[in-house]
A protein has these predicted regions:
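Acidic/polar, compositionally biased interaction segments
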Residues: 197, 237-387
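Beta-strand-rich N-terminal accessory domains
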Residues: 20, 79, 372-511, 517-520, ...
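Solvent-exposed beta-strand/loop surfaces of large extracellular or lumenal domains
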Residues: 199-207, 274, 313-333, 548-583
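Surface-exposed beta-strand/loop patches in extracellular or lumenal glycoproteins
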Residues: 301, 528-547
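Bacterial Sec-dependent N-terminal signal peptides
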Residues: 1-20
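Beta-strand-rich interaction surfaces with strong enrichment in secreted/lumenal proteins
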Residues: 73-79, 148-154, 217-218, 276-281, ...
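Carbohydrate-interacting regions of secretory-pathway proteins
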Residues: 19-262, 268-271, 281-290, 294, ...
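Short, well-ordered beta-strand segments enriched in hydrophobic/aromatic residues
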Residues: 87, 91, 512, 521-529
Length: 596
């Protein structure tokens, strides 16, 4: 349980971050944009289009060629200057296109149509572009480029997400660089593709000759069409809280509540920072820490406490955090504080012999990075748990487990891995695809490590969540669900499962085949048997929001395309503002592809 909890905490950003948006109602946030840049309401492209279709309005930043050819002056520069920053943006590329985002106008994260590439390099999507020096000699000019850890690119024409956590280079008072720029993290479509990458200087194509503490966001605009939306950021330039010398009183005995006893402490002393390491025993003690907390500016500050046992955090006598916790449980509490000096107190007790001693305190305000107020060794690192990977290298692999889908734990799930690198999770109870992904197969650590308490497993590649619903309905009727279905098992064809169901409402048997098709997964639904309702069956291709029919035989939903042949689809409005794409069956079989 403790390991699971810690992994969940790691997956959650520490502390809230305030997203400032770059408004995309006009181009006023940018410095002298070329005529190629416009603001539109929406852009559309199929996975084979090299150009966008646009609809007028606002909300999407679009670069399209409006002259004879592209020029370097088509790069787009923000008026905003930044140092340390966390940037989040959605982007879309047509087929074969190329762009990039330069932090401070100097350090490029590559945007490229890398869809389907088996091996990726520094110039693929999510890569940190190489540096360049002509003096190194012909063929050796490029150096220090960093490939993404894996190919996390979606198909062209789909919206993709990019998050960049960037630490600017540091300079002394004389302007001499004393620390390099660092890409602390780059996350492409939910996958970490770069982490703690230090760049010794500017990458190729920078618009400045020298490094500096600040610079603009630069979007490469001279390599082809590209679109952006939801441009958000947080800069980390504000000062944060600091802690002065720490005094402590140490008591021994059985303590059940964090109340300082009236008796004389066993020992007292002073420390440069918070730490448990002055406690000579493992249990049956109470520590009372006091320190002066300096607040630089009026603001709301979040304090995050960690301890093994019970404790209480007070500021100016007001209790912020209290309770019994394990050392890897982060407990946050926020309070507004005026600039100046404040009194901070922590009372910590541990009345049981098992488990390690630990004590930690972090502070965060909007506009500054998280800062630890404890000694580094006072908060233990978690036990390292090796990845337990299920591979599907030589033949299809079927693996049962529980799985989370849209926040709910599903218990009748089978994961199907394929040597092609195209995999999916399937809800046997519902007859539904829960998620599809590309890359490595399955992380079974939470199922097989130690006691395997959660019994869940997770995809290891670029994942697109599906609606998790049975893909058939009778005309003008609600979509079938598990109450209408009787699962009859599966049989294997070339090692891949064919799932079988009795569909009671339609008095038909349904066979569901899902196979890799190069671009994605091909799903074939077959109706078996005779029934008067057989001619009324419709395939439900997607249910959700932001669905679009791009052309006859091709639709999109957030995360993937849906492609089929034959009948014309209908886009329906259903309950709660959702949409549904339906296509009538023609005969006893219907096939469609999921492409991402």
């Amino acid at each position: 349980m403790k390991k699971l909890l810690f992994s969940l905490l790691l997956a959650t950003p520490l502390g809230a971050w305030a997203q400032q948006a770059i408004p995309l109602t006009d181009l006023s946030a940018f410095d002298q944009p070329s005529k190629n840049w416009t603001i539109e309401q929406a852009v559309f492209a199929t996975y084979s289009d090299t150009l966008f279709q646009v609809s007028p309005g606002s909300g999407v930043l679009v670069n399209t060629l409006r002259g004879g050819k592209y020029h370097r002056t088509d790069d787009l520069k923000s008026k905003m200057q930044h140092g340390d920053i966390r940037l989040l943006v959605d982007f879309m590329l047509p087929k074969g296109m190329n762009s990039g985002i330069y932090m401070q106008g100097r350090y490029e994260v590559q945007l490229y149509d890398s869809w389907g590439k088996k091996t990726v390099k520094y110039d693929d999507c999510g890569g940190i572009y190489e540096r360049w020096d002509d003096a190194r000699g012909k063929g050796n000019e490029g150096y220090e480029g960093y490939a993404p850890r894996q190919n996390a690119s979606k198909a062209p024409g789909l919206w993709q997400t990019l998050e960049i956590d960037f630490q600017a280079p540091r300079f002394d008072t004389n302007g001499k660089k004393i620390a390099n720029a660092i890409f602390k993290k780059v996350i492409l479509n939910g996958l970490v593709v770069q982490e703690n990458i230090e760049v010794s200087g500017m990458t190729r194509g920078a618009i400045f000759d020298q490094e500096a503490p600040f610079g603009p966001i630069l979007i490469q605009g001279d390599h082809g069409p590209v679109a952006f939306r939801n441009l958000r950021f947080e800069t980390y330039e504000k000062p944060t809280a600091s802690l002065g010398e720490v005094s402590y009183d140490y008591y021994t005995g059985k303590f059940t509540d964090p109340i300082v006893p009236a008796t004389k402490p066993v020992s007292s002393g002073k420390l440069p920072a918070l730490t448990y390491r002055v406690i000579p025993v493992n249990n049956d003690y109470l520590m009372h820490y006091k320190a002066e907390l300096t607040i630089p500016e009026d603001d709301t500050y979040e304090f995050q406490t960690y301890w093994t046992g019970s404790g209480e955090l007070k500021i100016d006598g007001k209790v912020l955090n209290q309770g019994a916790h394990w050392f890897n449980e982060m407990v946050p509490a926020s309070t507004f504080l005026k600039a100046g000096k404040h009194q901070l107190e922590i009372i910590h007790i541990k009345d049981f012999p098992w488990g390690p001693k630990a004590l930690g305190l972090n502070v965060k305000r909007i506009g500054s990075r998280l800062v630890s107020l404890h000694e580094r060794t006072s908060l233990l690192d978690p036990d390292a748990v090796g990845l337990i990977e299920v591979k599907a290298n030589a033949e299809p692999v079927l693996q049962r487990s529980f799985a989370f889908h849209l926040g709910k734990k599903k218990t009748h799930v089978i994961h199907v891995g394929d040597p092609s690198g195209l995999h999916y999770s399937y809800d046997l109870k519902q007859g539904a695809i829960l998620q599809v992904w590309r890359g490595k197969f399955l992380d079974a650590t939470q199922m097989w490590d130690n006691r395997g308490e959660p019994q869940t497993s997770e995809p290891l590649g670029l994942t697109v969540v599906q609606d998790g619903k049975f893909p058939l309905a009778l005309a003008h009727q609600a979509q079938a669900d598990s109450t209408d279905l009787v699962y009859k098992g599966y049989r294997l064809e070339a090692g891949r499962p064919v799932f079988m169901y009795e569909w009671t409402a339609a008095k038909l048997r349904v066979e569901d085949r899902i196979q890799p098709s190069g671009n994605g997964l091909k799903r074939t639904l077959t109706l078996v048997g005779t029934s008067p309702q057989k001619t009324d069956v419709e395939a439900v291709l997607a249910t959700g929001h932001h669905l679009s029919i791009l052309q006859n035989g091709l639709a999109s939903q957030p995360g993937n395309f849906i492609e089929w042949e034959g009948a014309t689809a209908e886009l329906l409005k259903i309950a709660s503002g959702a949409q549904q794409i339906r296509v009538p069956f023609s005969g006893a079989q219907f096939t469609f592809d999921l492409i991402w």
